[in-house]
């Protein structure tokens, strides 16, 4: 990897990391005022806990040398053997994906989950669910990779994975007592959405792992898609309610 691509991937990794506090603001602005801090911490603590888990064993279970079709190995525990620059860059970028994925799930159970319980869930889910699925699809030994599965920027590993987990979590914790609650802080929601939009340039454009034409195309498509979604939301809101709104 040349110096330009190294710099690009470091920037993209930082952009993806920025998405997690952005998600914290986004979710925090949607819940009731008394639950803002706990909701924000759900996302924010993922940065610390998942970073440690990823370095100690998460990366090794996902991409460890000598893995089989279903799981990696413990050959790279604590990043042992992760010495060359290209591998380190890849491990860092993948760590940012692992951080935001469980944070996405918290929107399904915010206000209804004890923080200590969430910490246990966070460690177990990244270890037992995220790492194996990342291995299946993104590691060259993974069984889905061998079948030709394509996942350029986490559509399956991150979003489908988190979505299914969110559905299961919502079913387990049950319905909200007050499903019609209003957002407590719309500026938080807008700030969070803006940070997510900005971070997505790193998420998508960095997934080619190189500063090249693929990155440029991904950057352009990402911005165009987000802009189109914004305009569509505003138009539908005006049709439905007669006014535009950031939230509903």
Q: At which residue positions do the language-model features occur?
A:
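Hydrophobic alpha-helical transmembrane bundles of multi-pass membrane proteins
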Residues: 1-248
């Amino acid at each position: 990897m040349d110096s330009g691509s190294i710099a690009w991937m470091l920037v993209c990794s930082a952009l993806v990391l920025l998405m997690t506090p952005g998600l914290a603001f986004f979710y925090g602005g949607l819940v009731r005022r008394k639950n803002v801090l706990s909701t924000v911490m759900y996302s924010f603590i993922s940065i610390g806990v998942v970073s440690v888990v990823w370095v100690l064993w998460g990366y090794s279970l996902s991409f460890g040398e000598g893995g089989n079709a279903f799981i990696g190995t413990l050959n790279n525990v604590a990043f042992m053997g992760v010495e060359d620059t290209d591998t380190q860059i890849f491990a860092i970028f993948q760590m940012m994906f692992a951080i935001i994925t469980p944070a996405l799930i918290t929107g399904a159970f915010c206000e209804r989950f004890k923080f200590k319980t969430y910490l246990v869930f966070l460690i177990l889910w990244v270890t037992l669910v995220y790492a194996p699925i990342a291995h299946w699809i993104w590691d060259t030994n993974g069984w889905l990779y061998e079948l030709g599965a394509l996942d350029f920027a986490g559509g399956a590993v991150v979003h489908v994975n988190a979505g299914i987990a969110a559905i299961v979590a919502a079913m387990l914790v049950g319905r909200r007592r007050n499903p019609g609650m209003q957002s407590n802080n719309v500026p938080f929601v807008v700030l969070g959405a803006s940070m997510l939009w900005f971070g997505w340039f790193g998420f998508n454009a960095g997934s080619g792992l190189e500063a090249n034409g693929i990155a440029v195309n991904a950057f352009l498509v990402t911005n165009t898609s987000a802009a189109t979604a914004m305009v569509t939301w505003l138009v539908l809101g005006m049709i439905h309610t007669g006014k535009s709104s950031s939230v509903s």
